[in-house]
C-alpha cells in the first residue's frame, strides 16, 4: 500500500524518499487502513500463549528535529522545522484537516506555530496507539513503548503525545549526550515523565 505512507511538506513520500536513512518509512496514522492493520498485526503476536506482552517502537512521525548531536551526521542544521522532515501532508491528512478547520495545511504560512495542525498530528498518532492498546489489552496482555524523552520534547520532535496514551509502561530514551546535556538533565526528564504519567503506568528510565 504505497498510498499509506507519510508525505512531507515538500510532497515527498516516505515510501520512496524516506528522511535521514533508508528504513525511515513511516505509515500515515490518518489513513483509514493503518490503525486496524497494525492492531491486528500486534494482536496476532500478543495472542501467542508464550507471549506476555508487546512493546511498541517508532510509533510516531519522523523526527522533524533530530537530537542536536546527530545534526553533523547528516550535514544539517535544524534550528527550524524544515519541509523535508515535516510530516504528514498526504491527501488524506490535508482533506481531514480542511474538513475540520477549513484550512489546507499546505497553505499555512507558519505550520510549526499552528496549534490546530500540531494537535491534529499528535491526535493521529495517539489514535493508532490507542487502537493497538485496546486490541492487546482485550487479549489481557501487557503493552509498553519506547518513547522520546520528556513528553514535551516528544510532542515537538516526533509528534508523540505519549502522556495521553494508555499503556502499561513507558521507556523514555533519555540519552543526555544526544542533546549535549549534563547528568542533571536526566533527572529533570525523568521527573517530567513520572509527573505526566501520574501513577497510571510505570516509567523505566
Regions found by a protein language model. Give the residues of each.
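Aromatic/pi-system hotspot detector in well-structured domains
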Residues: 49, 58, 121
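Aromatic- and acidic-residue-enriched segments that line the glycan-binding/catalytic groove
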Residues: 1-21, 58-107
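Glycoside hydrolase catalytic-domain groove-lining segments
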Residues: 82-205
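Active-site-adjacent "subsite" loops/lids of carbohydrate-active enzymes
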Residues: 1-49
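Active-site beta-loop-alpha junctions enriched in small/polar residues
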Residues: 1, 56-61, 148-150, 175-177
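A structural motif
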Residues: 50-51, 167
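Conserved, mostly hydrophobic/aromatic
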Residues: 38, 45, 54-57, 136, ...
